[in-house]
Amino acid sequence: MKKAIVFLANGFEEMEATGTVDILRRGGIDTKTVSITDDRKVIGAHNMEYTADATFTEIDLSDADALILPGGMPGASNLNNSEPVKEVLLQQYREGRIVAAICAAPMVLGGLGLLKGRKATCYPGFEPKLIGATVTGEAVEVDGNVVTGRGPGLVFNFGLALSLIHISEPTRRVVIS
């Protein structure tokens, strides 16, 4: 079974995280939420409290097929300030496995140089932070092992794009119906 990790930082965009997790789980992808702090309790950008499946130090990330960053502020900035998150993203990318980010979070990938020469999209206003990317403004961009999404209103597009990489056609039909 495929495995996806959705990182949660305080201030994350709730729709982007829960929508993505829901779509991937419906597609039969083993999807875990992981707090980037030592506390499983994470507060979203709109003050909704979530309990992550694990903390960063409690889970093995080495076999994840996809590492996913929801946006939201200050969540995306908190992800960007986490050296352990950035280290695993770089390793994942180097190994050719999926790194994905939506809304403001593609700035993390841009800052790591993972968008150089790739098509990418993000929430309006964050385009300058997608260093080296060809910013398209599309709902979702899939360029090699990098997936980016524009924002919360397009979370279904983002989640489906990720699921299409990992699920069979019959399962795909169930997820989108």
Indicate residue ranges for each PLM-predicted region.
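Conserved anion/nucleotide-ligand pocket segment
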Residues: 148-164, 168
